[in-house]
């Protein structure tokens, strides 16, 4: 199994890459979240990978983070979700956005992704519940923070907090709070321990 590729980026044409690793060119498909963070052609690149071997093909998928790769692995375990659909999900939603959609049971967010219908979205919500790490949920009846929760989560992750710590702190932020104030409140909650 190929778990990581480090080499020189030779080509990039969404979602396909060609990475030269000591004279061997590896064709790798990546989600758009990884694609947008790639260096320029000719520069070094390192990707975590998932290799899928089928009767008719050997496929290699690349990811910028372990969280993305782990989410991809969870997605392809779901009946009816293949590697291409999993890649589409990760291209349409970031991992924190997907975790929030699962926690809030927002099938509508998933059906906006090309190739995902209502039944598939509902299956994804059911199968992924409790498997994505960051629990961005709120108490029943509480108003969700919506997209600001994702921005707050990303800020806390960038500051070095774990997904679990960040998610717990976000629960302390009242609904309707802006991103800037939400970050301050979450940091205050984290400092109280």
Swiss-Prot record:
Which portions of the sequence form the region Flexible linker? Answer: 145-151
For the region Domain II, give the residue spans. 65-144
Provide the residue span(s) of the region labelled Domain III: 151-193
Q: Which InterPro entries match?
A: DNA_helicase_Holl-junc_RuvA_I (IPR013849), Hlx-hairpin-Hlx_DNA-bd_motif (IPR003583), NA-bd_OB-fold (IPR012340), RuvA (IPR000085), RuvA_2-like (IPR010994), RuvA_C (IPR011114), RuvA_C_sf (IPR036267)
Q: Which GO terms describe its cellular component?
A: cytoplasm; Holliday junction helicase complex; Holliday junction resolvase complex
Q: Where in the cell is it found?
A: Cytoplasm
GO molecular function ontology, one term from the record: ATP binding
Locate the region Domain I. 1-64
Q: Which GO terms describe its biological process?
A: DNA recombination; DNA repair
Swiss-Prot/TrEMBL keywords: Cytoplasm, DNA damage, DNA recombination, DNA repair, DNA-binding
The entry's free-text remark on domains says:
Has three domains with a flexible linker between the domains II and III and assumes an 'L' shape. Domain III is highly mobile and contacts RuvB.
For this chain, the family text in UniProt reads: Belongs to the RuvA family.
Oligomeric state and interaction partners are given as:
Homotetramer. Forms an RuvA(8)-RuvB(12)-Holliday junction (HJ) complex. HJ DNA is sandwiched between 2 RuvA tetramers; dsDNA enters through RuvA and exits via RuvB. An RuvB hexamer assembles on each DNA strand where it exits the tetramer. Each RuvB hexamer is contacted by two RuvA subunits (via domain III) on 2 adjacent RuvB subunits; this complex drives branch migration. In the full resolvosome a probable DNA-RuvA(4)-RuvB(12)-RuvC(2) complex forms which resolves the HJ.
Role, per record: The RuvA-RuvB-RuvC complex processes Holliday junction (HJ) DNA during genetic recombination and DNA repair, while the RuvA-RuvB complex plays an important role in the rescue of blocked DNA replication forks via replication fork reversal (RFR). RuvA specifically binds to HJ cruciform DNA, conferring on it an open structure. The RuvB hexamer acts as an ATP-dependent pump, pulling dsDNA into and through the RuvAB complex. HJ branch migration allows RuvC to scan DNA until it finds its consensus sequence, where it cleaves and resolves the cruciform DNA.
What name has this protein been given in UniProt?
Answer: Holliday junction branch migration complex subunit RuvA
What species is this protein from?
Cupriavidus metallidurans (strain ATCC 43123 / DSM 2839 / NBRC 102507 / CH34)
């Amino acid at each position: 199994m190929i778990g990581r590729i480090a080499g020189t980026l030779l080509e990039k044409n969404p979602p396909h890459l060609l990475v030269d690793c000591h004279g061997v060119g590896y064709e790798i498909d990546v989600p758009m979240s990884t694609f947008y963070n790639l260096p320029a052609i000719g520069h070094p690149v390192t990707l975590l990978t998932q290799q899928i071997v089928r009767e008719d093909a050997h496929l290699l998928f690349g990811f910028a983070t372990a969280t993305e790769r782990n989410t991809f692995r969870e997605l392809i375990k779901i009946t009816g979700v293949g590697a291409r659909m999993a890649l589409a999900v990760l291209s349409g939603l970031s991992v924190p956005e997907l975790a929030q959609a699962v926690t809030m049971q927002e099938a509508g967010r998933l059906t906006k992704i090309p190739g995902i219908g209502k039944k598939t979205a509902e299956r994804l919500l059911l199968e992924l519940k409790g498997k994505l790490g960051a629990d961005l949920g709120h108490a029943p009846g509480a108003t969700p923070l919506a997209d600001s929760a994702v921005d707050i989560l990303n800020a806390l992750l960038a500051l070095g907090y774990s997904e679990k710590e960040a998610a717990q702190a976000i629960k302390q932020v009242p609904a309707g709070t802006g991103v800037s104030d939400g970050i301050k409140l979450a940091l205050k909650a984290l400092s109280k321990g």
